[in-house]
Design a protein with these regions (language model features):
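Phosphate/ribose-phosphate-bearing ligand recognition and processing surfaces
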Residues: 91-184
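Glycine-/small-residue-enriched capping loops at alpha/beta junctions
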Residues: 1-116
Length: 184
């Protein structure tokens, strides 16, 4: 596991910011920034599908897709993570189509699936900030605020939440969000 750039205790859980390839993380579940088909795509979605192997695509094809703001869980197959939680974030349309609430729903749903499946650790990418063009700073504040709220009120066995970024430059958004919430 990479050394965290930031690590903070919130209730019973440790929240961490790391720079790493999410497909290499040995956690109970990694979150895939998926599209509604769940059949793979570019960015982190494509990387997760490639690393997990064809069995992931086969399982995803049986799920019938997923609505924006929601998530589905599959096995991790060839990944170090036991499971993949496929969260479908919103495409940014200037904030006029309920995008912040839909993004928060992705994080809540992923945490719910983690707890419902008896899992204890989860790693999130920056959902919707790539080709879906969600502003990275706003997305980081929504992600962290949602996770802190959920973990503080009802952790349900989740003891580790990792926010995983592909570069130091992108991780700064999350570090700033921690500071804005007074968690640094």
């Amino acid at each position: 596991m990479p050394t965290p750039l930031l690590s903070v205790e919130v209730g019973p859980a440790r929240l961490e910011v790391v720079v790493a390839d999410i497909t290499t993380l040995a956690v109970d579940a990694i979150v895939n920034a998926a599209n509604t088909s769940l059949l793979g795509g570019g960015g982190v979605d494509g990387a997760i599908h490639r690393a997990a192997g064809r069995e992931l695509l086969e399982e995803c094809s049986t799920l019938g897709g997923c609505a924006t703001g929601s998530a589905r869980i599959t096995r991790g197959y060839k990944l170090p993570a036991k499971h993949v939680i496929h969260a479908v974030g919103p495409v940014w349309s200037g904030g006029k189509k309920n995008e912040p609430d839909l993004l928060a729903s992705c994080y809540r749903t992923a945490l719910n699936l983690t707890a419902e499946n008896g899992l204890h650790s989860i790693a999130f990418p920056a959902i919707s900030t790539g080709v879906f063009r969600f502003p990275a700073g706003l997305a980081a504040r929504i992600a962290l605020g949602t996770v802190v709220s959920e973990i503080s009120t009802n952790a349900r066995g989740i003891d580790r939440v990792v926010f995983c970024y592909f570069s130091q430059e992108s991780a700064v958004y999350h570090i700033n969000a921690f500071a804005e919430l007074g968690l640094d």
